[in-house]
Swiss-Prot record:
It comes from the Bacteria. This is Flagellar L-ring protein. A lipid is attached at C22 (S-diacylglycerol cysteine). Belongs to the FlgH family. The basal body constitutes a major portion of the flagellar organelle and consists of four rings (L,P,S, and M) mounted on a central rod. The lineage of its organism: Bacteria, Pseudomonadati, Pseudomonadota, Gammaproteobacteria, Enterobacterales. One of its GO terms (molecular function) is cytoskeletal motor activity. One of its GO terms (cellular component) is bacterial-type flagellum basal body, distal rod, L ring. Residues 1-21 form the signal peptide. It is a lipid-anchor. InterPro entries: Flag_Lring (IPR000527). One of its GO terms (biological process) is bacterial-type flagellum-dependent cell motility. Keywords: Bacterial flagellum, Cell outer membrane, Lipoprotein, Membrane, Palmitate, Signal.
Amino acid sequence: MQKNAAHTYAISSLLVLSLTGCAWIPSTPLVQGATSAQPVPGPTPVANGSIFQSAQPINYGYQPLFEDRRPRNIGDTLTIVLQENVSASKSSSVNASRDGKTNFGFDTVPRYLQGLFGNARADVEASGGNTFNGKGGANASNTFSGTLTVTVDQVLVNGNLHVVGEKQIAINQGTEFIRFSGVVNPRTISGSNTVSSTQVVDARIEYVGNGYINEAQNMGWLQRFFLNLSPM
């Protein structure tokens, strides 16, 4: 008796664990890796006894006199103005119909069918029809606005800057995360050290959160289980 109870308990535990796994939906973050970068010190030049040196160390505190200071090195900051407004709509409809009719007769009925048709002429008629109507439509709209300051984590060979950044906002018992990454052309950076997100190449914008509000939006494990099994 105890052996059967232990066996039943083990099966029930495995079933509960498998059902719990149905509740978790894995998600891959759009922005992966570190969301900040530290300035990289350049190599120390070797003094050659001349006024003009072959290499000069990077001076991160350099302030241009006749030009705006713009990010150009790893660790420099840049403000991204989020101006995303995307909308899409799609509709489709289809109609199909088909009708058919067949008519044929027998002048002479075989003897073994006379009980069914009689001795007179037998006529057979068949008709059929098929009609199909279908309609579909979809609408989507997405608006994202705000600002986020990011850091240059890579300077590409052609001079473009790969930037990445994150902003965390704690509200009551939940935390909101805004992450951004992309490639910026230095020519699109304004004098106020800002660039619109619409001018960023390969932009990745992610807005997620955690806490009880985010957990309330997740489907329960039992409901998720029946959703996976339901054919409807």
